[in-house]
């Protein structure tokens, strides 16, 4: 088979199963409204949960820092790219979340890949929730360690997998809030089981940080759990981008030596780090609390109004509200029907989710108003499906 044939066959396979992904060009993609092709839509696809991407205080912080530092960092943090803005943000994050150290990464994908790649060796075992993010599972598959996946949120299955003999170390991997199902992991029980088997716990709280817990400290804080490795990302609740790993002093020093994604990547712009510090200040403030309260009320309003006889609504109380429709083509038709009525929603299909669980992944944000939720419900229940 030629290279071109391989490429063509892969694309054809996606087309015939209605799983071909595409990008949409938008003029505005964050916040309450999405603008595409000159038309304005209510935006139910954004991860900007607290509406901070448009916050004037955060925008101003980025602008001022760009004037001071320029628009790029100029290098890896190991060479010339670790500025006072990066250092300040790391210290603020560590203090906020109660860890000795925080290390910044350019993305959550890079952070997850870096930690697993650097830590896991031959004869080790990774035991991951089967619905863990692609960045975690890909890193686990590529590492020399054995990967075992436990049934989603099934702590008994997790315990059985950890009980089987392992010559090396074991790492349990889960998420705080799951990106496609919107539900939360039983973190306290998972941590208890991990410690009983002398395993470390890695929690990716991309969709919980900033949005849940006291001062927005996330799902782990809310559940009274402190994993050995906590990954937080800044493209959701923070409204910016990037990520950090929270850990001990020794693990941070280890990652600075052996995490190739960190050593060999240009660090985030200092202006971005300063904007993130400004975002953290908003998240921790009374305003941040008010934004979280409003978002929670909107989620409750949506769940109370959904017609359960027409849609399978998962047990999700986060900003992520998936409606399971099953069939790929039906999910695409439903998303298009919503767009025709001015509501922008995204159809999620395999391989992102298991076969037979295609869905509309609706995301609610603090930028929405109650009337927006009511309009979404009206359009959903009137969709010709």
UniProtKB/Swiss-Prot annotation:
The keyword Transferase applies. GO terms for biological process: biotin biosynthetic process. Homodimer. The gene is bioF. It catalyses: 6-carboxyhexanoyl-[ACP] + L-alanine + H(+) = (8S)-8-amino-7-oxononanoate + holo-[ACP] + CO2. This is 8-amino-7-oxononanoate synthase. Pfam families: Aminotran_1_2. Pyridoxal 5'-phosphate binds at residues 108-109, 179, 207, 233. The modification N6-(pyridoxal phosphate)lysine is found at residue 236.
